[in-house]
Design a protein with these regions (language model features):
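Acidic/polar N-terminal loop/beta-strand segments that form early-domain functional surfaces
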Residues: 8-10, 34-36, 68-69
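Histidine-acidic metal/acid-base catalytic patches
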Residues: 1-9, 13-29, 53, 85, ...
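Catalytic-core regions built around general acid/base machinery
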Residues: 48-58, 125-135, 195, 230-234
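Feature marks short, surface-exposed loop/turn motifs that line or immediately flank catalytic pockets
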Residues: 37-39, 70-74, 109-111, 151, ...
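N-terminal small/glycine-rich loop or linker at the start of catalytic domains
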Residues: 1-6, 64-75, 107-112
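Active-site acidic/histidine proton-transfer and metal-coordination neighborhood
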Residues: 13-21, 58, 74-172, 181, ...
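Glycine-rich, proline-tolerant flexible connector loops at the mouths of alpha/beta enzymes
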Residues: 32-57, 108-113, 117
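Short beta-strand segments at enzyme active-site cores
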Residues: 32-33, 64-68, 101-108, 143-147, ...
């Protein structure tokens, strides 16, 4: 099996202990951190982080990535940039401590209420990413841009950013479901993947299929979305041996304010998603 497995276990359990036990239930020993007890790991106090890291070390759990908030769906291009500068400076030392290189970012959605022109939007995004990349290079971390909200939500936009920013610290997280859900078409995801394959440093696994009424696409399991197997086969054929990090969004979707509840259903779905992913990949 060429790939390694991890995931956002905050979609299974709220507490760190619960997230760790979920990982162990599926036999995994690595996590991509985001929410712990409802708080983003990047916002933890020094004391909270030391407790988090100590627990992870004690349980033998590797930290693969930090699910950061820089440039994300809640921080449009008009947001005070100091918020993002504070985040990267706060979290970079913690990433080094955890021997973790991936800080997930996005690329600043335009302001819905007072949108900038296309050119002004691009200029401001590039300016911000350049400054963030200088910091990232100095800290030895990767700003892993997810194909989600922002200027780089399409392949052409992302490649424009790569060219303009000109930093090895800016690399791509390919989420295998975001574009399908945004555009109600799995072929849009394949197109993003195909155009940007050489940029990919990390993979988030999310899946989509048409809704029961034939309307908007909804999240689903990997074996219900044919673009997943196509992507995994091509990744293997082209030498990718990194992480597949699951972010099912079936029972929890952080961006939509849909946090995991206490029913246990989120964990059940997460575990099933993990096992069905392993089963699919084992047949490639």
């Amino acid at each position: 099996m060429p790939f390694q497995f991890t995931g956002f276990a905050d979609e299974a359990e709220k507490t760190l202990a619960g997230q760790i036990s979920t990982l162990k239930e599926v036999g995994w020993s690595a996590i991509e951190l985001r929410l712990i007890d409802g708080k983003n790991v990047c916002d933890q106090t020094p004391e909270e982080w030391e407790q988090t890291f100590g627990t992870l070390q004690g349980e033998g759990i590797q930290v693969v990535g930090f699910g950061g908030q820089i440039g994300n769906w809640a921080r449009p291009v008009t947001t005070d940039f100091q918020v993002d500068l504070d985040e990267i400076r706060r979290v970079a030392p913690r990433m080094r401590q955890a021997n973790c290189k991936f800080l997930r970012i996005m690329s600043y959605p335009n302001d819905a209420d007072s949108p900038l022109s296309q050119e002004a939007w691009k200029t401001e995004v590039v300016k911000r990413l350049k400054e963030l990349c200088v910091i990232a290079e100095g800290e030895g971390i990767v700003l892993a841009h997810e194909n989600c909200n922002g200027y780089g939500d399409n392949p052409e936009g992302y490649l424009e950013l790569v060219e303009e920013v000109g930093s090895t610290a800016l690399q791509l997280i390919m989420d295998t479901g975001n574009n399908s859900l945004h555009d109600n078409d799995i072929e849009v995801t394949w197109r993003y993947y195909e155009i940007c394959r050489e940029q990919i440093t990390h993979v988030h696994v999310k899946c989509a299929k048409p809704g029961p009424d034939g309307g908007d696409h909804v999240t689903c399991h990997v074996d219900e979305d044919p673009v997943q197997e196509r992507i995994f086969k091509h990744l293997e054929a082209t030498g990718y041996d990194g992480w597949l990090s699951i972010e099912p969004h079936i029972k929890a979707a952080i961006h939509a304010g849909k946090d995991v509840d206490d029913s246990g259903e989120g964990r059940t779905v997460w575990v099933e998603f993990a096992r069905r992913l392993e089963s699919l990949v084992s047949k490639i």
